[in-house]
């Protein structure tokens, strides 16, 4: 079954790492190991780091008109910073992979199963 591992954290905390080269290198190395471990286990199907929320555009269609707003829809303490798409047998396995995510120690990781239509597309269906 396909699951999204959604990585949330405080962008301010990440921004502070930019001034600490050693800490930033350690974080990048931890994520490289995490991705390599998922790849070696054959569960990784995709993933990416997201740009900061100030680069986001929210789109709404109201009364047939497209309205765009700079930034995310809602202000929150933690922002979505990246994701992984994994294919594992069950939620327990997905949670185990999420717990290994480097950001689990100081942010939060949401595990969400993909819907039936998304899973069918991932498996080569229509």
Regions found by a protein language model. Give the residues of each.
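Conserved, structured core segments of small domains
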Residues: 1-126
């Amino acid at each position: 079954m396909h699951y999204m591992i959604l990585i949330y954290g405080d962008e301010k905390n990440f921004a502070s790492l930019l001034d600490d080269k050693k800490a930033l290198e350690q974080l990048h190395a931890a994520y490289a190991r995490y991705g390599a471990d998922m790849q070696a286990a054959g569960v990784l199907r995709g993933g990416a780091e997201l740009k900061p929320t100030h680069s986001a555009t929210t789109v709404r269609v109201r009364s047939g008109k497209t309205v765009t707003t700079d930034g995310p829809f809602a202000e929150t303490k933690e922002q979505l910073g990246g994701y992984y798409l994994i294919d594992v047998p069950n939620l327990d396995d997905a949670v185990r992979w999420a717990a290994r995510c480097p950001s689990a120690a100081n942010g939060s990781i949401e595990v969400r199963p993909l819907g039936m239509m998304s899973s069918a597309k991932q498996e080569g269906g229509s």
